[in-house]
Swiss-Prot record:
IGPS catalyzes the conversion of PRFAR and glutamine to IGP, AICAR and glutamate. The HisH subunit provides the glutamine amidotransferase activity that produces the ammonia necessary to HisF for the synthesis of IGP and AICAR. It comes from Nitrobacter winogradskyi (strain ATCC 25391 / DSM 10237 / CIP 104748 / NCIMB 11846 / Nb-255). It is found in: Cytoplasm. This is Imidazole glycerol phosphate synthase subunit HisH 2. SUPFAM superfamilies: Class I glutamine amidotransferase-like (SSF52317). Its EC number is 4.3.2.10, 3.5.1.2. Heterodimer of HisH and HisF.
Length: 212
């Protein structure tokens, strides 16, 4: 059984993620700091809201350094969800009105950019179910059928990766949308696995059994 630290930085909704972890038969511990992370086998970084606000909360609580110790030094598997995935990037242009991009955690060589679908009839945010195309194999997708790769999205920004090898899956919404990224012991999903019914639970279960 995995012991999962779910990071709560004050503006993210952790309840549905906790329920999904427990549904998969694992122990979930909601943590605001180093307590919980040090004893965890896996870490989940959920996220809703604005990039800049989230990063301020994370830095104010010292969670950026705590994550670096747990993920980069101790090698614990990290799953970052929705805004959480975007926070892995180097920068984001969200609400960067003065031209200065917000700085992220920098765990993935990527920048976050506003969705600009070519079809003007497509509304922003991208909200609802969408299929993803698997670009390469990864343990979080093991034994998942191509017909079971539909997930629930809610977002207005998306990650643009410098290294295409970091991209595991893409969706299409008037443009290519990075849906899953992975590097070493880090994985991020732009969609919400905890809200994606059977496909999301299967992916979550794969993550919780992953020991990179």
């Amino acid at each position: 059984m995995a012991r999962v630290a779910i990071i709560d930085y004050g503006i993210n909704n952790v309840r549905s993620v906790r329920n999904a972890v427990e549904y998969c038969g694992h122990e979930a511990v909601v943590t605001h700091g180093n307590d919980g992370i040090a004893d965890a086998s896996h870490i989940i970084l959920p996220g809703v809201g604005a990039f800049g606000d989230a990063m301020k909360k994370i830095r104010d609580r010292g969670l950026d350094e705590i994550l670096a110790r747990g993920v980069c030094e101790a090698g614990k598997p990290l799953l970052a969800v929705c805004l959480g995935m975007q926070l892995l990037a180097k920068t984001s242009e969200e609400h960067a009105d003065d031209g200065e991009f917000f700085q992220g955690l920098g765990l993935i060589e990527a920048d976050v950019r506003r969705l600009r679908p070519k079809d003007p009839d497509l509304k922003i945010p991208h909200m609802g179910w969408n299929n993803i195309t698997k670009l390469r194999e990864h343990p979080i997708l093991v034994n998942m059928r191509e017909t079971n790769l539909a997930f629930y999205f809610v977002h207005s920004f998306a990650m643009s990766c410098e290294n295409e090898d970091d991209v595991v899956g893409r969706a299409t919404y008037g443009q290519d949308v990075t849906a899953i990224v992975a590097r070493d012991n880090i994985v991020g999903t732009q969609f919400h696995p905890e809200k994606s019914q059977d496909s999301g639970i299967e992916l979550m279960s794969n993550f919780l059994q992953w020991n990179p």
